[in-house]
Amino acid sequence: MSSYSDFSQQLKTAGIALSAAELHGFLTGLICGGIHDQSWQPLLFQFTNENHAYPTALLQEVTQIQQHISKKLADIDGFDFELWLPENEDDVFTRADALSEWTNHFLLGLGLAQPKLDKEKGDIGEAIDDLHDICQLGYDESDDKEELSEALEEIIEYVRTLACLLFTHFQPQLPEQKPVLH
């Protein structure tokens, strides 16, 4: 997989007005919502590129990213799914903006995969509400960067946990196989 900045540049070069964080959030939302077949591609084109296909090389890269996300989310025991945010940890404001964008596009993807998302109750409903709040994350540039950085890392970890929770919740349930009696 490309680096965050290289991939963001690939998107920009292709005329796609998304950051790597936004695209990663969108794909993660679709996957967490239960879309595992190729139906993610038309949704990607429709909602990120005015219904136009991506250039072949870029689509191959996006497909690898989609497969990587699926693999990481499916490995619940490993719990090593990560949000794809800018690597530059010195610029906490850029990372905070990217988290907000990731979360916003995650909810878009999740909502497309689960159209009745607003009807969810209990823990899942609370998780959705929390994600909506995180989309509107605000800060003041005069805030203490160290405190903001620590808070941001906690929020990133919380969003990561919620993504895994939602992935588990919305996965199609396979019918329980009963043992065959002879």
UniProtKB/Swiss-Prot annotation:
Pfam families: UPF0149
Domain of life: Bacteria
InterPro entries registered for this protein in UniProt: YgfB-like (IPR011978), YgfB-like_sf (IPR036255)
GO CC annotations on file: cytosol
UniProt xrefs under PANTHER family: UPF0149 PROTEIN YGFB
Family: Belongs to the UPF0149 family.
Name recorded for this polypeptide: UPF0149 protein PM1723
Lineage: Bacteria, Pseudomonadati, Pseudomonadota, Gammaproteobacteria, Pasteurellales
